[in-house]
């Protein structure tokens, strides 16, 4: 079952689901009035009231990639990101360039888990290219997303490019919240994130 199928099925069972709107960018907030102003795909400003708002800023690759021939040039969701094959993570124009992590123009996987799983593939393929062989090892797009449900409970969802579940820990049910998934997030992942911020990883 694809992850998205499960999410849609559960969403449809909610009595009052939150409305989902696409193709709008946040352009302003009236904090006192609890109003968020969005620009829609027709360049019209749409204002919505809110009780709670969580904002994810627009994402892009680093400017040295965006402003170079290394970036995807064609319009679309990958424009500006590193122009790599989603399978080999080898650059589509410059065969001696490979990508890792959140600068890649791949359909999914801008997480630390993606970097961890894709690094051995990139190393293998890079060594092959150095020795005159083709990059032959393929990456499935693995990514992992620990979702906190509440204090002491989380879901660990692991999936590939197509949204298919590919759990790596058999003791954690990917579509059910559990204390074990929460413990993994707080006991292992959180210290790793903090160490990374301090430059220790």
Labelled PLM ranges:
Residues 1-24:
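Rossmann-like dinucleotide-binding cores of NAD(P)H-dependent redox enzymes
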Residues 22-35:
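A conserved short coil-to-beta-strand element within the FAD-binding core of flavoproteins
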Residues 32-39, 77-83:
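Short gly/ser/thr-rich secondary-structure transition/capping motifs
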Residues 47, 156-201:
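C-terminal auxiliary extensions adjacent to catalytic cores
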Residues 100-149:
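A conserved FAD-binding loop/helix module that cradles the flavin
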Residues 46-117:
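FAD-site-proximal beta/loop scaffold in flavoenzymes
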Residues 39-46:
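A structured beta-alpha segment of the ubiquitous adenosine-cofactor-binding alpha/beta core
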Residues 80-98, 149-169:
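FAD-binding beta-loop-beta segment adjacent to the flavin cofactor pocket
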């Amino acid at each position: 079952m694809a992850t998205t199928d499960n999410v849609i099925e559960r969403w449809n069972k909610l009595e009052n689901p939150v409305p989902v709107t696409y193709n709008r960018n946040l352009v302003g907030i009236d904090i006192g009035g609890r109003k968020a102003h969005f620009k829609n795909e027709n360049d019209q400003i749409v204002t919505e009231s809110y009780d709670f708002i969580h904002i994810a800023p627009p994402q892009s690759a680093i400017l040295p990639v965006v402003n170079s021939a290394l970036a995807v040039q064609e319009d679309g969701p990958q424009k500006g990101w590193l122009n790599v094959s989603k399978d080999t993570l080898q650059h589509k124009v410059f065969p001696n360039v490979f990508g890792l992590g959140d600068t890649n123009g791949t359909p999914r996987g801008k997480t630390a888990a993606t970097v961890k799983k894709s690094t051995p593939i990139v190393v293998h393929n890079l060594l092959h290219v150095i020795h005159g062989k083709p990059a032959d090892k393929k990456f499935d797009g693995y990514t992992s997303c620990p979702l906190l449900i509440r204090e002491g409970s989380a879901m660990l969802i692991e999936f590939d490019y197509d949204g298919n579940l590919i759990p790596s820990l058999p003791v954690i049910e990917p579509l059910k919240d559990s204390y074990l998934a929460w413990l993994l997030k707080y006991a292992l992942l959180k210290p790793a994130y903090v160490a990374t911020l301090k430059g220790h990883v």
